[in-house]
């Protein structure tokens, strides 16, 4: 959320601008496009990270980061991001992305996947009580289109951001 505070005092003009909320998206398939659009409507800053970025699906993102090697993510500084979603649909890739994110101070880490695989992830990474980890990702709003999934993900992130969940 971009918030601006303006005041005029002693013949001086002061303006404080709060940094926009930042969303880090892992994966660049067709389903990511709707998430970027929805995040843009929320005035969030979006960054997409992937091994082979599919630019036609992510051209509305603010920043694109293409990794040369998957393991490069483990050495990146992710501390400037508020939230992240893992949408790569590859268990090996998802596990490495999650490992990198768990070393960050992010308030929201969401992962797409089926309930069985998400139980495995929670068990394997010891995430049963981690309040910032959401998997399967998104609120259950009953939709299954890319747009409805994007809405459910952004709604969950917004609820977490505002202390509702």
Regions found by a protein language model. Give the residues of each.
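Segments forming oxygen-rich coordination pockets for charged ligands
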Residues: 1-50, 58-63, 82, 96, ...
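A general structural motif
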Residues: 20, 80-81, 106, 130
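Short beta->alpha connector loops
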Residues: 28-31, 90-92, 115
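Residues in the short beta-alpha loop(s) of Rossmann-like NAD(P)-binding domains
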Residues: 51-52, 115
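Conserved N-terminal Rossmann-fold NAD(P) cofactor-binding segment
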Residues: 54-72
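Short amphipathic alpha-helix with an adjacent loop that forms part of the alpha/beta core around
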Residues: 70-80
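ADP-ribose/adenylate-binding Rossmann-like module
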Residues: 83, 88, 99-124
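Adenosine-phosphate binding glycine-rich loop
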Residues: 112-116, 120-165
